[in-house]
Amino acid sequence: KYPYIAGMGVYIFKKEILLNLLRWRFPTANDFGSEIIPAAAREINVKAYLFNDYWEDIGTIKSFFEANLALAEQPSKFSFYDASKPMYTSRRNLPPSMISGSKITDSIISHGCFLDKCRVEHSVVGIRSRIGSNVHLKDTVMLGADFYETDAERGDQLAEGKVPIGIGENTSIQNCIIDMN
């Protein structure tokens, strides 16, 4: 089906072998896939696992962006809801997102977000994101936030001339990756 087999960057080593490879055999190597694994395969017993399910190479900013946006397309190459292939992730114990007066199409909205009178098209919105009124996101990957700011903290930030977390009112963003916080 595919003309090549790619390394996914997932490796399992015995601790002693890994330390030996890194400390003594390849102390100046920078990359497992192109340096350490090929050289180690000539010297030690290396096995591969052929993975036939969904996988995307996200080794460049462009491929990271495109792979994230592809998750919002229907039908998507990857299903978050396939009971035969459950997805396990870290528990975050976040509340559901609060969406008020907004229009969202072909997008993924994560947990704990606040969206107020905004428009989100073909975008991925990460955890704890805050999107203000009259905001238009299109073809955007918004990675979210590590923590919440209270309304008082947001007010203090603005009073000090600083920028609070999230997308402020009357903003239009297209074809963009917005980093966390």
UniProtKB/Swiss-Prot annotation:
Kindly state the subunit structure of this protein: Heterotetramer.
List cystine links: none
Database matches in Gene3D superfamilies: Hexapeptide repeat proteins (2.160.10.10), Spore Coat Polysaccharide Biosynthesis Protein SpsA, Chain A (3.90.550.10)
What does the entry report regarding how activity is regulated?
Highly active without 3'phosphoglycerate, and is only slightly affected by the activator 3'phosphoglycerate and inhibitor orthophosphate.
Can you cite a GO biological process for this protein? starch biosynthetic process
Q: Which UniProt keywords apply?
A: Allosteric enzyme, Amyloplast, ATP-binding, Chloroplast, Nucleotide-binding, Nucleotidyltransferase, Plastid, Starch biosynthesis, Transferase
Instruction: Kindly provide the name given to this protein in its UniProt entry.
Output: Glucose-1-phosphate adenylyltransferase large subunit 2
Q: In UniProt terms, what function does this protein have?
A: This protein plays a role in synthesis of starch. It catalyzes the synthesis of the activated glycosyl donor, ADP-glucose from Glc-1-P and ATP.
Q: Which PANTHER family match?
A: GLUCOSE-1-PHOSPHATE ADENYLYLTRANSFERASE LARGE SUBUNIT 1, CHLOROPLASTIC-RELATED, GLUCOSE-1-PHOSPHATE ADENYLYLTRANSFERASE-RELATED
Pathway as given in its UniProt record: Glycan biosynthesis; starch biosynthesis
Q: What reaction is this protein's catalytic activity?
A: alpha-D-glucose 1-phosphate + ATP + H(+) = ADP-alpha-D-glucose + diphosphate
Query: Which is an annotated GO molecular function term of this record?
Result: glucose-1-phosphate adenylyltransferase activity
Q: Where is the protein situated, by its record's location annotation?
A: Plastid, Chloroplast; Plastid, Amyloplast
Tissue specificity comment: Leaves.
State the SUPFAM superfamilies in the record: Nucleotide-diphospho-sugar transferases
A Gene Ontology CC term for this entry?
A: chloroplast
Record's Pfam families? LbH_GLGC, NTP_transferase
Primary site of residence: plastid
Q: Which family does it belong to?
A: Belongs to the bacterial/plant glucose-1-phosphate adenylyltransferase family.
**Which species is this UniProt entry from?**
Hordeum vulgare
Listed EC numbers: 2.7.7.27
- Its domain of life reads Eukaryota
Q: Does the keyword section mention Nucleotide-binding?
A: yes
